[in-house]
Structures are given as C-alpha cells and as structure tokens.
C-alpha cells in the first residue's frame, strides 16, 4: 500500500483506476512550471552531475537558497549520483574520500550545491523535481463514510489461515506556485 501510494503521489494518472494525478502529471500540465529537457539516453553516472546542475541552474532566484528547497530524484538518478561522487564515473581510478568508495554512507543525507537530494522511489526513471517542500501538498480524507480499513480473518469463512485487508480512502496532491518548481 505504501509503495503504491508513493508511486501515485509522484507518477499517478487519474485515468488509471485507484490512482489520482501525481506530481509529474500535474506539473507537466502547468505551463508555469519550469521544464528542463531530459538528456537523450537517460541519466547515468557520467552525465548525472551535468543533469542535476541543469536542474539547479533553472531554479528561480526567488526559491534558490530557501530553507526547505529540495531536489526529489528518481532511484536511477540517485544511484548514478552516488556512483559519480566516488569518482568511479570518471574512470580515473578514484575510490572516494579516504578510499571508502561511493559517498552514500548508511543512507545519510546527500546534497548537490548545498541543496538536499531526496530519493523519491515513486518518480519514474530519469525524473527530478526541484521545489520547496512547502509548495507541494498531499491530502487525504479521514472523516468520511468513504474511508475504511479492515482486516478480515478468513478462518471462519473458508477455514484458511489467511487474512485479507480492505482499504478504501481518498487522497490527492497539489502544488501552489508552478513558477517556483523545476521539472526535469
């Protein structure tokens, strides 16, 4: 449930049953959002620094330096960046700081030009979103007869040792100021 919700938050499409429009869908539809053209062939360890740099260079001067500015990146972008940090992408035989290899120790904080990179597993490959956290919203209805979570013990029904989970809920996302967001 958590992974499906994560995927829908970032990449959902209202036309798909059980989904709502995710940030990628709403940001693409907003003409005010700053769009950065993706590199042909996708992001990899050899070009990731330039691609994240293109995203950072497109951030509005009103937002750059904001306390809650973050760059949300897909799994392949984070993986490529971590690999590039160790020097392995440059083929110079680099082994990272103190020969410790790549730089993402125990899943700690990763930054680019001082801006936190946040792994967003729900983003599709080669996607990045630079935005203030306060400009991105997630909402759900909790006090309604349309909201329900149930665990059904199937032992009394069919004699099995199974449980079934029923979940019904509503959710959605929204952004406020499109011109303060960069979509790669």
Annotated model-derived regions:
Residues 17-50, 82-184:
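Sequence/fold signature of self-assembling virion shell proteins
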């Amino acid at each position: 449930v958590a992974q499906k919700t994560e995927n829908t938050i970032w990449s959902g499409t209202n036309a798909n049953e059980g989904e709502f429009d995710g940030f990628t869908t709403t940001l693409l539809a907003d003409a005010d959002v700053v769009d950065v053209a993706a590199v042909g062939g996708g992001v990899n360890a050899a070009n990731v620094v330039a691609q994240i740099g293109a995203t950072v260079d497109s951030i509005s001067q009103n937002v750059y330096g904001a306390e809650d500015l973050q760059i949300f990146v897909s799994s392949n972008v984070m993986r490529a960046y971590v690999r590039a940090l160790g020097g392995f992408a440059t083929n110079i035989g680099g082994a990272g700081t103190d020969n410790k290899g790549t730089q993402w120790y125990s899943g700690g904080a990763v930054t680019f030009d001082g801006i936190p990179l946040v792994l967003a597993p729900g983003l599709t490959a080669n996607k990045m979103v630079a935005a203030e956290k306060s400009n991105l919203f997630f909402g759900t209805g909790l006090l309604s007869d349309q909201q329900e979570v149930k665990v059904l013990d199937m032992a009394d029904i069919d004699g099995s040792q199974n449980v079934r989970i029923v979940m019904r809920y509503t959710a959605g996302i929204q952004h406020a100021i499109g011109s303060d967001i960069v979509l790669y």
